Amino acid sequence: MKSYTPYFILLWSAVGIAKAAKIIIVPPIMFESHMYIFKTLASALHERGHHTVFLLSEGRDIAPSNHYSLQRYPGIFNSTTSDAFLQSKMRNIFSGRLTAIELFDILDHYTKNCDLMVGNHALIQGLKKEKFDLLLVDPNDMCGFVIAHLLGVKYAVFSTGLWYPAEVGAPAPLAYVPEFNSLLTDRMNLLQRMKNTGVYLISRLGVSFLVLPKYERIMQKYNLLPEKSMYDLVHGSSLWMLCTDVALEFPRPTLPNVVYVGGILTKPASPLPEDLQRWVNGANEHGFVLVSFGAGVKYLSEDIANKLAGALGRLPQKVIWRFSGPKPKNLGNNTKLIEWLPQNDLLGHSKIKAFLSHGGLNSIFETIYHGVPVVGIPLFGDHYDTMTRVQAKGMGILLEWKTVTEKELYEALVKVINNPSYRQRAQKLSEIHKDQPGHPVNRTIYWIDYIIRHNGAHHLRAAVHQISFCQYFLLDIAFVLLLGAALLYFLLSWVTKFIYRKIKSLWSRNKHSTVNGHYHNGILNGKYKRNGHIKHEKKVK
């Protein structure tokens, strides 16, 4: 019998080639944790037959791979200088400088780098010739929107942070949807709702008058046509892929073109390296505690490091701590310092009891995946929002690095280790996170394929961006109702006054026509006596 298998294979290959797309990704110019996610996506896209290009500055370190290619440009940073810049920001924050000031300084560097990209004529012309099918924007660095507009290519947002911006257009009732950086939950009292409203208004003003205008000035400088505002570009995104999850995020209204894909880096634990396996095997029934503040935070202040070392040294558990810098003087004998560690594999080990973290999103999703309780000390950015949700969900405790004491840290660690409710909640959230159609990577690739297949998937976009502020909040209807009420009031007032005048006029006439209850036959007063008899008039001679 003739086999048709080769023909089916050939047909399938042809279909795959037909659907293959060229995708360009514009990652932020710093924060290597974001690149971990994008490299994972690039590998998955490669398996689907797509070709991915990273737009990176010269000198930025990235391992070569057959899964993606690189388009370099002369930017303001290379890997060494960007890391040094980020560590300087951390030192400034630890020394007491306002976090907001440091974040705005980062924004200034984002826009300076964006100016270099947009003004690089050779770079832009080369990218235009590539005829990309899709551009992925990380909204942490909003230059991606400008590049997409410049290239005239469809684009989608992939947010690597815990961020659900109001600019998406989804309803956000402030009574139960906490604003980013508010440190609130979906259960708010009166004062908290007032705070949430204030943070929302400040955020919208900051975005409208401080953030977006910086990029608009770049577009005006290089006369980008057709003229569009940054709001138009943000609203023009085909899809919003957000790194959050139903296990972590508070329930809230959303839109069809918004999908949750948090947990891109989650995976089962692999066997530990031999030296670490021996160390873990040496842990008694108390197990071990993992400590890591992420790849982006290489140096803690001496004060914080000493507090951590003191609290960790009092635990009966063994401690493995990802740490760089001078060794704390009060380091306990139970604590092992190491500059790099396989975090996911340690989190998945059966002997782990707790995780002490800064609340970075990638770390928290790995923690949720493996069902491990957390003590979080957020430092900046979305760390606070992430740990607020972890604490509200019952799988961890949030501590403030500026005020926490060694005793408070020790007590928090003991609590999450010895109170079984924290591990039970962590394991339940792990079940919820995993009980979804496919791994987050597969869901992300599906949606990228979807918007490519449907040429931007405009049918998913709500009309919210085509209506004005007055229409959205029904202010025009309120105006019509108020105007109608005012007209009705004046009409009723006029009718009432008219009727009143008529009644008053009739009453006045009747009053003048009657004296002591007797009618005067229509003759004016004075022609009759008061007793009702006729009064004779004297003739005038």
Swiss-Prot record:
InterPro entries according to UniProt: UDP-glycosyltransferase (IPR050271), UDP_glucos_trans (IPR002213), UDP_glycos_trans_CS (IPR035595)
Biological or metabolic pathway of the protein: Sphingolipid metabolism; galactosylceramide biosynthesis
Entry EC no(s): 2.4.1.47
Transmembrane segments: 472-492
Location in the cell: Membrane; Endoplasmic reticulum
UniProt keyword NAD, yes or no: no
Domain of life per record: Eukaryota
Keyword Oxidoreductase: no
Reaction(s) catalysed by this chain's protein: an N-acylsphing-4-enine + UDP-alpha-D-galactose = a beta-D-galactosyl-(1<->1')-N-acylsphing-4-enine + UDP + H(+); an N-acyl-sphingoid base + UDP-alpha-D-galactose = a D-galactosylceramide + UDP + H(+); N-(2-hydroxy-hexanoyl)-sphing-4-enine + UDP-alpha-D-galactose = N-(2-hydroxy-hexanoyl)-beta-D-galactosyl-sphing-4-enine + UDP + H(+); N-(2-hydroxy-hexanoyl)-sphinganine + UDP-alpha-D-galactose = N-(2-hydroxyhexanoyl)-beta-D-galactosylsphinganine + UDP + H(+)
Record's bilayer topology term: Single-pass membrane protein
GO cellular component terms listed in the entry, alphabetical order: endoplasmic reticulum; endoplasmic reticulum membrane
Glycosylation sites: 78, 333, 442
Gene Ontology molecular function, alphabetical: N-acylsphingosine galactosyltransferase activity; UDP-galactose:glucosylceramide beta-1,4-galactosyltransferase activity
Biological processes, Gene Ontology terms: central nervous system development; cytoskeleton organization; galactosylceramide biosynthetic process; glycosphingolipid biosynthetic process; neuron projection morphogenesis; paranodal junction assembly; peripheral nervous system development; protein localization to paranode region of axon
Keywords: Endoplasmic reticulum, Glycoprotein, Glycosyltransferase, Lipid metabolism, Membrane, Signal, Sphingolipid metabolism, Transferase, Transmembrane, Transmembrane helix
Leader sequence residues: 1-20
Assigned protein family: Belongs to the UDP-glycosyltransferase family.
Function per UniProt: Catalyzes the transfer of galactose to ceramide, a key enzymatic step in the biosynthesis of galactocerebrosides, which are abundant sphingolipids of the myelin membrane of the central nervous system and peripheral nervous system. Galactosylates both hydroxy- and non-hydroxy fatty acid-containing ceramides and diglycerides.
Protein name per its UniProtKB record: 2-hydroxyacylsphingosine 1-beta-galactosyltransferase
Source species: Homo sapiens (Human)
